[in-house]
């Protein structure tokens, strides 16, 4: 059915009103009323949030989400609170949060000023930069080696913007292919349909660790931009932000955060039991003391 311009405008207006209403609501009150909290997860953001089995997300960010749930249950005195899980992508995570479908998104989301116009962010829990995953046999070692080649980038990510800008500045003439998720971009490189997969370096190390043939892949290039990751929550909800930040502050001050980091970034991770072996960055060490939610520009 083809909608008239008037009907289309009306529907868009309703959707915008619903999103505005959701943004203004008290998340804790919503959870209390519904007796349910809905957590978002990613399907292939290794080691932050990814599937170990169908419908079973695991990872560093999943454990952060679970710590928030424990505090919500405590504050609401609801030990049997229902915890619903919903997969999200880079494209739909913000709309699903602002319209009230999900209550918290902890995955591999960059905290930046542009997104801060639509959502709020908790204390930063990781820092990363854009690099490229390639096949070792390609002999690609830096960005200049990609001139005129196809690269696969997940649509809806800051990496897409960073690489487009770099491509224009350096006149690399890249053929950029947008993909639905990280796993799709990895497959394009593995099958030689793309020369590289630019993405946050930690996600590339995680995907490489769980790839079919990790030894055939490598992460190359200088980091184009260092950015923080943080959990997303709705804007204008200081009570819920205080709860989430309070949970993270407790984890960071008690040393529990560092134990979680060691588990997911230093030791072997499921399902391939390969270790990423990534020491904690200076930026993250500093933020364990600063407890900052400062965005990237």
Predicted region positions:
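Extended ligand-binding regions for polar small-molecule ligands
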Residues: 63-71, 144, 149-150, 155-157, ...
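Acidic, polar ligand-binding/catalytic clefts
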Residues: 66, 77-145, 286-293
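Extracytoplasmic small-molecule ligand-binding "clamshell" domains
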Residues: 24-26, 30-105
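Bilobed "Venus flytrap"/periplasmic-binding protein-like clamshell domains
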Residues: 38, 43-47, 57-74, 110, ...
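A ligand-binding cleft/hinge motif common to bilobed small-molecule-binding domains
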Residues: 92, 106-117, 161-169, 188-191, ...
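Periplasmic-binding protein-like
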Residues: 43, 126-137, 201, 209-248, ...
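Sec/Tat signal peptide C-region and signal peptidase I cleavage site
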Residues: 17-22
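Ligand-binding clefts/hinges and TM-proximal coupling segments of bilobed small-molecule sensing domains
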Residues: 158-176, 215-219, 248-297
């Amino acid at each position: 059915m083809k909608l008239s311009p008037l009907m289309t405008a009306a529907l868009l207006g309703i959707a915008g009103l619903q999103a505005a209403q959701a943004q203004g609501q008290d998340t804790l009150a919503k959870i209390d009323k519904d007796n349910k909290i809905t957590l978002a997860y990613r399907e292939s953001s290794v080691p932050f949030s990814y599937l170990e089995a169908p419908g079973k997300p695991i990872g560093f960010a999943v454990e952060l989400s679970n710590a928030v749930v424990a505090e919500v249950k405590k504050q609401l005195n609801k030990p049997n609170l229902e915890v619903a899980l919903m997969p999200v992508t880079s494209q739909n995570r913000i709309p699903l949060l602002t319209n009230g479908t999900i209550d918290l998104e902890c995955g591999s989301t960059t905290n930046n000023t542009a997104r801060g116009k639509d959502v709020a962010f908790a204390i930063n829990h990781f820092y990363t930069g854009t690099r490229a995953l390639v096949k070792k046999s390609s002999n690609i070692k830096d960005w200049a080696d990609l001139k005129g080649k196809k690269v696969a980038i997940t649509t809806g990510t800051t990496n897409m913007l960073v690489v487009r800008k770099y491509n224009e500045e350096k006149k690399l003439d890249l053929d950029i292919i947008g993909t639905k998720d990280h796993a799709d971009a990895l497959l394009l490189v593995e099958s030689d349909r793309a020369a590289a997969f630019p993405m946050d370096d930690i996600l590339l190390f995680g995907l490489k660790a769980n790839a079919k043939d990790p030894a055939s892949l490598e992460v190359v290039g200088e980091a184009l931009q260092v950015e923080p990751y943080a959990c997303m929550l709705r804007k204008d909800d200081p009570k819920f932000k205080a709860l989430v930040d309070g949970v993270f502050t407790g984890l960071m001050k008690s040393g529990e955060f560092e134990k979680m980091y060691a588990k997911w970034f230093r030791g072997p991770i499921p399902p391939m039991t390969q270790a990423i072996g990534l020491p904690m960055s200076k930026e993250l060490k500093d933020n364990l003391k600063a407890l900052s939610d400062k965005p990237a520009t």
